[in-house]
Design a protein with these regions (language model features):
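Conserved alpha-helix/loop element of class I SAM-dependent methyltransferases that forms part
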Residues: 121-144
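Conserved class I S-adenosyl-L-methionine
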Residues: 143-153
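Conserved SAM-binding loop of SAM-dependent methyltransferases across substrates and taxa
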Residues: 154-165
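Conserved SAM-binding motif I beta-strand of class I
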Residues: 167-172
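A short acidic, Gly/Pro-enriched loop at the edge of an enzyme's catalytic core
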Residues: 207-218
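A short glycine-rich, Lys/Arg-flanked "PGG" loop and its adjoining helix->strand segment in the class I
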Residues: 234-261
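Conserved beta-strand signature within the Rossmann-like core of class I S-adenosyl-L-methionine
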Residues: 262-269
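Class I S-adenosyl-L-methionine
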Residues: 283-347
């Protein structure tokens, strides 16, 4: 017997027994059920996280970044469509323009406000720690300054930085992001600044290089430029690696050119603990700079920090964000963690 039918008949029998008993028993008052409060989601969840992070955020820049969550808008649900390989994503409007046969091969993906702000990478407020690091090394940003995020991953932190008055550019190769952030208001003016989103390989594609432009006060890359992804020193599955499509010298020259004189570049990588030698290699566990000190220097940069450890601060942040209590994928932030950053500067 199907489970639904069993449940239906059980419920019916229970109702009949209750009806018979009710005629012989005095009426009783059933206390109302307590409905638990809905868990904050989307922009509200980020505002809640900001309150938790504020007491451990050390810089004015970080505090302003958290406070800007008050300006994050609510976002209406939207639907994306992807092919079976997930190499191509379409907006609802783009999918509607396809032939019936093409549309039938697509899978729909429902995007709520939480997915809009977090995509598949979790809270964008994890950027607050890199901002604290930058401030501790003397970085100051003025309204109108340009900020570039290489491999931005989600739009939330870009909007927060734009709310502070910065002109922010995010570049990424993930085809989902192009479709996800294609509605009016996803980019453009935001607060006192602006958000520009570019989809394509930087610096391999000259058109993307031209669109990125120059004059940046800050270039930041979080969890993308890892040695394990780009120059693994152990065998790794090629599908988990990143091919920048150019020599290291050419890549570093392109980053150098984006910065204004005196501009700063930060690589900040939060990783699981480095894979032991007797275990299969996990590329994203090696968060060291993919570029050597000699390569940075040859490109013209001044190296301020190379593979500096930052575990304690991120452990604290991770607990406040609940990474260790995630019901689907709890992270052992006490033991299974590595955090490294590299900070370089273009001479003024």
């Amino acid at each position: 017997m199907p489970l639904q039918e069993v449940m239906r008949r059980t419920a019916l029998a229970t109702s009949l027994v209750a009806l018979a008993l009710s005629s012989a028993c005095a009426p009783t008052t059933t206390p109302p059920k307590t409905i638990p409060a809905a868990k904050p989601a989307g922009a509200e969840a980020l505002r809640d996280e900001a309150k938790r992070l504020a007491p451990v955020t050390s810089s004015a820049l970080g505090q302003h970044f958290l406070a800007a969550t008050a300006e994050l808008p609510h976002v209406a649900p939207r639907t994306l469509f992807a092919d079976s390989s997930k190499a191509h994503y379409f907006t609802a409007r783009e999918a509607a323009a396809l032939s019936p046969a093409e549309r039938s091969a697509l899978k729909s993906i429902e995007i709520d406000e939480e997915s809009y702000y977090e995509t598949k990478y979790g809270s964008p407020l994890s950027y607050v720690r890199p901002l604290d690091v930058l401030a501790a090394h003397g970085l100051t940003l003025a309204k109108g300054d340009r900020v570039l995020d290489f491999g931005y991953g989600y739009v939330g932190h870009l909007r927060l930085l734009a709310t502070l008055g910065f002109r922010v550019t995010g570049v990424d190769v993930d085809p989902m992001l192009r479709a996800l952030y294609s509605e009016p208001g996803d980019s453009g003016n935001a607060g006192g600044g602006s958000v520009t989103l570019l989809n394509g390989p930087f610096p391999k594609d000259p058109k993307i290089v031209e669109a990125v432009g120059t004059g940046y006060a800050l270039v930041i890359s979080k969890n993308v430029l890892k040695r394990g992804y780009i120059h693994p020193d152990r065998p790794a599955d090629p599908k988990h690696l990143i091919d920048l499509g150019m020599t290291d010298d050419a890549v570093l020259a392109a980053f150098f050119a984006t910065l204004r004189p005196g501009g700063t570049m930060l690589i900040y990588n939060i990783c699981p603990a480095l894979s032991p030698p007797d275990k299969p290699f996990v590329p994203w566990s090696d968060g060291r700079s993919p570029f050597t000190r000699e390569a940075w220097t040859a490109a013209g940069f001044v190296v301020l920090e190379l593979d500096r450890d930052d575990i304690p601060a991120v452990q604290q942040m991770a607990r406040l964000l609940g990474w260790d209590k995630d019901p689907d994928d709890p992270w052992d932030v006490e033991h299974d963690i590595s955090v490294l950053y590299t900070l370089v500067k273009r001479p003024g």
